[in-house]
Amino acid sequence: MNFIIPYYCDERLKYTQKYLKKAGYNEVFDKSEANFAVFAPACDKEMFKGYENVHVFYGVGDYDKKYKNCYDYNKRDDFKYKNAILTSEGAIALYKENSNKAIYGSNILITGFGKIGKSLCNVLKAMGSKLTICARSDIDKAQAKTIADNVIDFKALQCQNYDIIFNTVPAIYFTKNEIDTFKNDIKYIELASFPGGIDKHYAKIKNIDIIDGSKLPSRYSKISAGYLIGETIDKMIKEGKNWKSDIAWQAHFVHLAKQ
Protein backbone atom coordinates (compact mmCIF):
# COMPACT_ATOMS: atom_id res chain seq x y z
CA MET A 1 0.00 0.00 0.00
CA ASN A 2 1.35 3.43 -0.95
CA PHE A 3 1.43 6.56 1.17
CA ILE A 4 2.50 10.15 0.67
CA ILE A 5 3.57 12.78 3.20
CA PRO A 6 3.15 15.96 1.17
CA TYR A 7 4.19 18.43 3.86
CA TYR A 8 7.20 17.67 6.05
CA CYS A 9 6.42 20.76 8.12
CA ASP A 10 6.61 18.86 11.41
CA GLU A 11 9.71 16.90 12.44
CA ARG A 12 7.56 14.12 13.84
CA LEU A 13 6.58 13.15 10.32
CA LYS A 14 10.15 12.07 9.53
CA TYR A 15 9.73 9.33 12.12
CA THR A 16 6.16 8.58 11.06
CA GLN A 17 7.60 7.89 7.61
CA LYS A 18 10.24 5.56 9.06
CA TYR A 19 7.61 3.67 11.06
CA LEU A 20 5.28 3.22 8.09
CA LYS A 21 8.06 2.04 5.77
CA LYS A 22 9.23 -0.45 8.39
CA ALA A 23 5.63 -1.66 8.73
CA GLY A 24 5.60 -2.50 5.02
CA TYR A 25 4.08 0.59 3.43
CA ASN A 26 5.69 2.19 0.39
CA GLU A 27 6.31 5.94 0.21
CA VAL A 28 5.49 7.67 -3.07
CA PHE A 29 5.81 11.30 -4.10
CA ASP A 30 2.92 11.59 -6.53
CA LYS A 31 -0.50 11.71 -4.88
CA SER A 32 -2.06 9.95 -7.86
CA GLU A 33 -0.09 6.84 -6.84
CA ALA A 34 -0.97 7.06 -3.12
CA ASN A 35 -3.60 5.06 -1.28
CA PHE A 36 -3.42 7.47 1.64
CA ALA A 37 -1.74 10.69 2.77
CA VAL A 38 -0.40 11.62 6.20
CA PHE A 39 -0.66 15.16 7.54
CA ALA A 40 0.87 16.62 10.70
CA PRO A 41 -1.21 16.84 13.90
CA ALA A 42 -1.73 20.56 13.30
CA CYS A 43 -2.65 21.25 9.68
CA ASP A 44 -4.33 24.02 7.72
CA LYS A 45 -7.48 23.45 5.69
CA GLU A 46 -5.64 24.65 2.60
CA MET A 47 -3.46 21.53 2.80
CA PHE A 48 -6.45 19.36 1.93
CA LYS A 49 -6.92 20.94 -1.48
CA GLY A 50 -6.06 18.47 -4.21
CA TYR A 51 -6.43 15.47 -1.90
CA GLU A 52 -10.15 14.92 -2.38
CA ASN A 53 -9.52 11.50 -3.94
CA VAL A 54 -6.94 10.31 -1.41
CA HIS A 55 -7.60 9.03 2.10
CA VAL A 56 -6.06 11.57 4.49
CA PHE A 57 -4.93 10.89 8.07
CA TYR A 58 -4.50 14.02 10.18
CA GLY A 59 -4.51 15.02 13.84
CA VAL A 60 -6.40 18.20 14.81
CA GLY A 61 -9.75 19.62 13.74
CA ASP A 62 -13.13 18.39 12.56
CA TYR A 63 -12.18 17.90 8.93
CA ASP A 64 -13.42 14.31 9.19
CA LYS A 65 -16.94 15.69 9.63
CA LYS A 66 -16.62 17.87 6.54
CA TYR A 67 -14.67 15.54 4.27
CA LYS A 68 -15.54 11.87 3.86
CA ASN A 69 -11.94 10.94 3.02
CA CYS A 70 -10.40 12.36 6.24
CA TYR A 71 -9.57 10.43 9.41
CA ASP A 72 -8.41 11.96 12.69
CA TYR A 73 -5.91 9.72 14.52
CA ASN A 74 -5.96 12.15 17.46
CA LYS A 75 -9.54 11.14 18.30
CA ARG A 76 -8.53 7.60 19.19
CA ASP A 77 -8.27 6.88 22.91
CA ASP A 78 -5.12 4.78 22.56
CA PHE A 79 -3.36 7.63 20.75
CA LYS A 80 -4.53 10.21 23.29
CA TYR A 81 -3.44 8.02 26.21
CA LYS A 82 0.09 7.47 24.87
CA ASN A 83 0.40 11.09 23.75
CA ALA A 84 -0.55 12.17 27.28
CA ILE A 85 2.41 10.19 28.63
CA LEU A 86 4.75 11.99 26.22
CA THR A 87 3.17 15.30 27.27
CA SER A 88 3.67 14.63 30.97
CA GLU A 89 7.31 13.69 30.41
CA GLY A 90 7.77 16.90 28.43
CA ALA A 91 6.07 18.95 31.15
CA ILE A 92 8.56 17.72 33.73
CA ALA A 93 11.50 18.40 31.39
CA LEU A 94 10.12 21.89 30.78
CA TYR A 95 9.88 22.55 34.50
CA LYS A 96 13.47 21.42 35.07
CA GLU A 97 14.66 23.77 32.34
CA ASN A 98 13.00 26.68 34.12
CA SER A 99 13.81 25.91 37.74
CA ASN A 100 16.70 24.94 39.97
CA LYS A 101 14.39 23.34 42.54
CA ALA A 102 13.62 19.65 42.81
CA ILE A 103 10.19 18.18 42.27
CA TYR A 104 10.81 15.97 45.29
CA GLY A 105 9.16 17.61 48.29
CA SER A 106 7.55 20.41 46.26
CA ASN A 107 3.92 21.36 46.79
CA ILE A 108 2.33 20.84 43.39
CA LEU A 109 -1.16 21.56 42.09
CA ILE A 110 -2.54 19.90 38.96
CA THR A 111 -5.76 21.43 37.68
CA GLY A 112 -7.77 18.93 35.68
CA PHE A 113 -7.76 15.15 35.79
CA GLY A 114 -8.12 14.11 32.18
CA LYS A 115 -5.60 11.91 30.39
CA ILE A 116 -2.74 14.40 30.77
CA GLY A 117 -3.62 15.17 34.38
CA LYS A 118 -3.74 11.47 35.27
CA SER A 119 -0.43 10.70 33.59
CA LEU A 120 1.26 13.71 35.16
CA CYS A 121 -0.16 12.81 38.57
CA ASN A 122 1.34 9.31 38.46
CA VAL A 123 4.79 10.56 37.49
CA LEU A 124 4.94 13.48 39.94
CA LYS A 125 3.76 11.36 42.85
CA ALA A 126 6.41 8.74 42.06
CA MET A 127 9.00 11.54 42.20
CA GLY A 128 8.06 12.38 45.79
CA SER A 129 6.04 15.56 45.37
CA LYS A 130 3.28 16.72 47.71
CA LEU A 131 0.45 16.57 45.24
CA THR A 132 -2.96 18.24 45.10
CA ILE A 133 -5.45 17.54 42.31
CA CYS A 134 -8.20 19.98 41.43
CA ALA A 135 -10.95 18.03 39.66
CA ARG A 136 -14.52 18.63 38.60
CA SER A 137 -16.45 15.36 38.48
CA ASP A 138 -17.10 12.99 41.37
CA ILE A 139 -15.53 10.12 39.41
CA ASP A 140 -12.33 12.09 38.81
CA LYS A 141 -12.16 13.09 42.46
CA ALA A 142 -12.59 9.49 43.58
CA GLN A 143 -9.81 8.31 41.24
CA ALA A 144 -7.52 11.17 42.25
CA LYS A 145 -7.86 10.29 45.93
CA THR A 146 -6.16 6.95 45.26
CA ILE A 147 -3.00 8.76 44.12
CA ALA A 148 -2.80 12.36 45.33
CA ASP A 149 -2.23 13.70 48.84
CA ASN A 150 -5.16 16.07 48.52
CA VAL A 151 -8.13 16.52 46.18
CA ILE A 152 -10.12 19.74 45.87
CA ASP A 153 -12.94 21.17 43.79
CA PHE A 154 -12.53 24.18 41.52
CA LYS A 155 -14.89 26.09 43.82
CA ALA A 156 -12.39 25.61 46.65
CA LEU A 157 -9.34 26.62 44.63
CA GLN A 158 -6.71 28.23 46.88
CA CYS A 159 -3.17 28.80 45.69
CA GLN A 160 -1.04 30.23 48.48
CA ASN A 161 0.85 27.03 49.29
CA TYR A 162 1.98 25.81 45.88
CA ASP A 163 5.47 25.85 44.42
CA ILE A 164 4.36 24.59 41.01
CA ILE A 165 1.06 24.61 39.12
CA PHE A 166 0.44 22.43 36.07
CA ASN A 167 -2.77 23.52 34.38
CA THR A 168 -4.51 21.18 31.92
CA VAL A 169 -7.92 22.89 31.75
CA PRO A 170 -8.71 25.35 28.91
CA ALA A 171 -10.82 27.63 31.10
CA ILE A 172 -9.64 30.61 33.14
CA TYR A 173 -9.82 29.69 36.82
CA PHE A 174 -6.75 31.64 37.94
CA THR A 175 -7.97 35.23 38.11
CA LYS A 176 -6.92 38.21 40.26
CA ASN A 177 -8.06 36.62 43.53
CA GLU A 178 -6.04 33.46 42.97
CA ILE A 179 -3.00 35.16 41.44
CA ASP A 180 -2.72 37.55 44.39
CA THR A 181 -2.09 34.55 46.65
CA PHE A 182 0.66 32.99 44.49
CA LYS A 183 4.12 32.57 45.97
CA ASN A 184 6.62 35.02 44.50
CA ASP A 185 8.70 32.23 42.96
CA ILE A 186 5.85 30.01 41.78
CA LYS A 187 6.21 28.17 38.48
CA TYR A 188 3.01 28.11 36.44
CA ILE A 189 3.14 25.68 33.50
CA GLU A 190 0.38 26.03 30.93
CA LEU A 191 -0.51 22.71 29.30
CA ALA A 192 -4.03 23.64 28.22
CA SER A 193 -5.06 24.87 24.80
CA PHE A 194 -6.49 28.36 24.24
CA PRO A 195 -7.48 30.29 26.31
CA GLY A 196 -5.39 28.52 28.94
CA GLY A 197 -6.22 28.66 32.63
CA ILE A 198 -4.87 32.00 33.84
CA ASP A 199 -5.57 35.70 33.37
CA LYS A 200 -2.44 36.44 31.34
CA HIS A 201 -2.78 40.22 31.56
CA TYR A 202 -2.97 40.26 35.36
CA ALA A 203 -0.27 37.60 35.67
CA LYS A 204 2.04 39.87 33.67
CA ILE A 205 1.27 42.79 35.99
CA LYS A 206 2.21 40.57 38.96
CA ASN A 207 5.38 39.33 37.20
CA ILE A 208 4.15 35.74 37.16
CA ASP A 209 6.09 33.73 34.61
CA ILE A 210 3.71 31.64 32.50
CA ILE A 211 5.71 28.77 31.04
CA ASP A 212 4.38 27.69 27.66
CA GLY A 213 3.73 23.95 27.61
CA SER A 214 2.28 23.67 24.11
CA LYS A 215 3.30 20.93 21.66
CA LEU A 216 5.46 19.13 24.22
CA PRO A 217 5.62 15.75 22.42
CA SER A 218 7.10 17.40 19.32
CA ARG A 219 9.50 19.48 21.43
CA TYR A 220 10.85 16.76 23.72
CA SER A 221 9.93 13.39 22.18
CA LYS A 222 9.69 13.93 18.43
CA ILE A 223 10.95 10.43 17.61
CA SER A 224 8.49 8.66 19.91
CA ALA A 225 5.70 11.04 18.90
CA GLY A 226 6.34 10.38 15.21
CA TYR A 227 6.38 6.63 15.73
CA LEU A 228 3.11 6.93 17.66
CA ILE A 229 1.43 8.62 14.69
CA GLY A 230 2.64 5.86 12.38
CA GLU A 231 1.60 3.11 14.78
CA THR A 232 -1.88 4.59 15.12
CA ILE A 233 -2.40 4.97 11.38
CA ASP A 234 -1.26 1.37 10.85
CA LYS A 235 -3.79 0.19 13.45
CA MET A 236 -6.59 2.24 11.89
CA ILE A 237 -5.99 0.78 8.45
CA LYS A 238 -5.76 -2.80 9.71
CA GLU A 239 -8.83 -2.50 11.92
CA GLY A 240 -11.04 -0.69 9.42
CA LYS A 241 -13.61 -0.16 12.19
CA ASN A 242 -14.44 1.83 15.32
CA TRP A 243 -12.98 5.02 13.93
CA LYS A 244 -15.23 5.89 10.99
CA SER A 245 -18.98 5.47 10.91
CA ASP A 246 -19.24 4.91 7.16
CA ILE A 247 -19.38 1.11 6.75
CA ALA A 248 -18.48 1.23 3.05
CA TRP A 249 -15.29 3.12 3.78
CA GLN A 250 -14.44 0.73 6.61
CA ALA A 251 -14.75 -2.16 4.18
CA HIS A 252 -12.58 -0.32 1.66
CA PHE A 253 -9.80 0.07 4.20
CA VAL A 254 -10.00 -3.60 5.13
CA HIS A 255 -9.54 -4.32 1.42
CA LEU A 256 -6.54 -1.96 1.25
CA ALA A 257 -4.96 -3.57 4.30
CA LYS A 258 -5.05 -6.95 2.55
CA GLN A 259 -3.27 -5.69 -0.56
State each model region's role.
Residues 20-34, 44-47, 153-155:
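A short, well-structured beta->alpha microelement
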Residues 79, 211-259:
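C-terminal helix-to-coil terminal segments
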Residues 9, 136-137, 192-194:
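Residues in the short beta-alpha loop(s) of Rossmann-like NAD(P)-binding domains
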Residues 2, 26, 33, 107, ...:
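Residues at the starts of beta-strands that form the adenosine-phosphate
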Residues 42-53, 144-219:
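Rossmann-like adenosine-cofactor binding region
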Residues 39-50, 54-105, 213, 232, ...:
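Glycine/serine-rich phosphate-binding loop and adjoining beta1-alpha1 elements at the start
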Residues 4-14, 20, 104-124:
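Glycine-rich adenosine-cofactor-binding loop
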